[in-house]
Amino acid sequence: MYCVQCEQTMRTPVGNGCAYAQGMCGKTAETSDLQDLLVAVLEGLSAWALAARSVDIIDHDIDSFAPRAFFSTLTNVNFDSERIVGYAKEAIYLRESLKSRTLAKNAAIQVAHPKAEIQLEGNDLASLQKQAQRFALNNDKAQVGDDLHGLRMLCLYGLKGAAAYMEHAHVLGQYDDEIYAEYHRYMAWLGTDPADMNELLDNAMGIGQMNFRIMALLDKGETQAYGDPTPVSVNVRPVAGKAILISGHDLKDLQMLLEQTEGKGINVYTHGEMLPAHGYPELKKYKHLVGNYGSGWQNQQSEFAKFPGPVLMTSNCIIDPNVGNYGDRIWTRSIVGWPGVKHIKGDDFSEMIEQALSLEGFPYSEIEHLITVGFGRQTLLNAADTVIDLVSQKKLRHVFLVGGCDGSRGERSYYTDLARAIPQDCLIMTLACGKYRFNKLDFGTLEGLPRLLDVGQCNDAYSAIMLAVNLAEKLGCGVNDLPLSLILSWFEQKAIVILLTLLSLGVKNIYTGPTAPAFLTDNLLAILNEKFGMRAITTPEQDLQEILSA
């Protein structure tokens, strides 16, 4: 096992990365190794997808399958070895079919790619794990050096994040052939073990640029399906009655759940990154979408244990449900998996709904505690002139974007302390699950504007970017000249690709934490600092002083 993709990976004096029987996330060495094998097979599949495109064969089934299967290898998504092998088998089946059709059109085509012909060597997990070790990500790390290895990981993990957003957009019916072709190019290229530092840096930025277009596609899918989010108050306390909790990012799953539970006397609660769903007109119209439950994903074992109904995981993040003894009440969808947990393959939630009806639900309603969400792209753009007026009148000094992934590391209290310390003449935008560090606090208003603006899910960084671009255009300056600072928290691969997106767009002086990715060496961090001014967080007091005195 070698895995260094998330913020909680092991860090030791002799090297970084989870490398024993089980990773810090709970992923076994078996599952981790099999995910490496799956990635290698997918790299070969992308090589054939490119070859097929050269003879005008575009297979939409492969285009949708490839990033979805890749998504299953992200942190806290799929811990089920059998399902990982299932994805690998399906990838090989699709590859062989595509290969036959491609060669039938042009028998002279050759795909000289090191992973284009991988076959599974055995049917049992032990044999496949042994084969998988040939594709471990650190096999040539000692030969190529830590810097080059780190850049490979930056590209790989960034592309994983982009693949996740591609799947979210695809679920909503969004498809762009140019994006899928570009994805296959990057995936196939990674499979060749690239060894040029400049090429790796350039392609890291290219992956970021591609992801900007993917986020635009996802924004289009969400707003076309559910309308533009508008500000709404959300109750974060339980309401008496039967209950289902839905977590993850997939708004379509939430819509289907709301449709199938309507009129059945079941209250639906959002968890984690589902919180922004309350702002969408076509979702908040359901009266039994009663509120949000819980906090950051890392607290789910204690919070889900107390939830008196079933829990539906639609994407990341899932962690061991056996710790809280709720394994019989948690259900997975799509790419999510945990051994022994019930998985819903189709769109019929009736079995889970029956379970909800059989459980006690909440016995009484607690006193409401309301928070506000729904400051989506259009709402932010509509407020642009107001923001400019407040800046020109010197009533608004600075805007802070404080958000990203949450996690269990104690240093993450920095973000709570920072938000509390931000002066009253400043606005705070937030997004992703990092918001749970402070989104239940009362920040008041500034000239009628809420000081805390919840922009949405992690992918809604697109909304913040579009606001910044709009403000810069109206003010006749660059984005980096705005009174705007980004203080980001990272945990996994979606955060990595959002960072690459921001850097590829030329956004500078980003603060990141709570720690640097373990795959980025001091040399690589120095390069990012020199090129982009990217820096590590220090203390709230020191960082605020530096930002506000600039």
UniProtKB/Swiss-Prot annotation:
Principal cellular location given in the protein's record: cytoplasm
Keywords recorded for this protein, A-Z: 2Fe-2S, Cytoplasm, Iron, Iron-sulfur, Metal-binding, Oxidoreductase
Cofactor(s) this protein cannot do without: [2Fe-2S] cluster; hybrid [4Fe-2O-2S] cluster
HAMAP family (UniProt xref): Hydroxylam_reduct (MF_00069)
Localization per record: Cytoplasm
Protein name per UniProt: Hydroxylamine reductase
EC number: 1.7.99.1
Function: Catalyzes the reduction of hydroxylamine to form NH(3) and H(2)O.
Modified-residue entries (Cysteine persulfide), positions: C405
Gene Ontology biological-process entries: response to hydrogen peroxide
InterPro entries in alphabetical order: HCP/CODH, Hydroxylam_reduct, Prismane-like_a/b-sand, Prismane-like_sf, Prismane_a-bundle
Naturally occurring in which organism (per UniProt): Proteus mirabilis (strain HI4320)
Residues the record lists as binding hybrid [4Fe-2O-2S] cluster: H249, E273, C317, C405, C433, C458, E492, K494
Xref: CDD domains: HCP
Top EC class of this enzyme: oxidoreductase
Cofactor: binding comment: Binds 1 [2Fe-2S] cluster.
GO molecular function annotations of the record: 2 iron, 2 sulfur cluster binding; hydroxylamine reductase activity; metal ion binding; peroxidase activity
Pfam family, one: Prismane
Family: Belongs to the HCP family.
Gene encoding the protein: hcp
Positions with a binding annotation for [2Fe-2S] cluster: C3, C6, C18, C25
Catalyzed chemical reaction(s): A + NH4(+) + H2O = hydroxylamine + AH2 + H(+)
GO CC terms, sorted: cytoplasm
